[in-house]
């Protein structure tokens, strides 16, 4: 990922209290195409809300020009949790 994009993603994440930003899914596996969304796994600062998570998602989509999903470890479904944690790569 280009350094400028990485910095932009991390700046947006910081505005919403998101840390430890990681990518998982088809982008992390190198299987993405132009229709693929980008899946982000984040840790949110204490006191942050779903509004922060939603704002983060909207701003990332605007910046990247692609659909984005943002989840926390708590928000991961049990059946995919171990796979996501295994394949997640830091931004």
Please describe what each predicted stretch is.
Residues 85-91:
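Short hydrophobic/aromatic patches at helix-to-coil boundaries
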Residues 3, 44-75:
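Metal-dependent nucleotidyltransferase catalytic core
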Residues 21, 38-40, 68:
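Conserved beta-strand core positions
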Residues 25, 30-49:
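Catalytic metal-binding acidic patch
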């Amino acid at each position: 990922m280009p350094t400028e994009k990485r910095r932009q993603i991390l700046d947006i994440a910081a505005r919403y209290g998101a840390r430890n930003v990681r990518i998982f899914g088809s982008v992390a596996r190198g299987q993405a195409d132009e229709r693929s969304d980008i899946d982000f796994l984040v840790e949110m600062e204490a006191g942050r809300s779903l509004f922060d998570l939603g704002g983060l998602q909207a701003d990332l989509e605007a910046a990247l020009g692609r659909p984005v999903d943002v989840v926390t470890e708590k928000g991961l479904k049990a059946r995919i949790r171990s796979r996501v944690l295994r394949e997640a790569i830091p931004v």
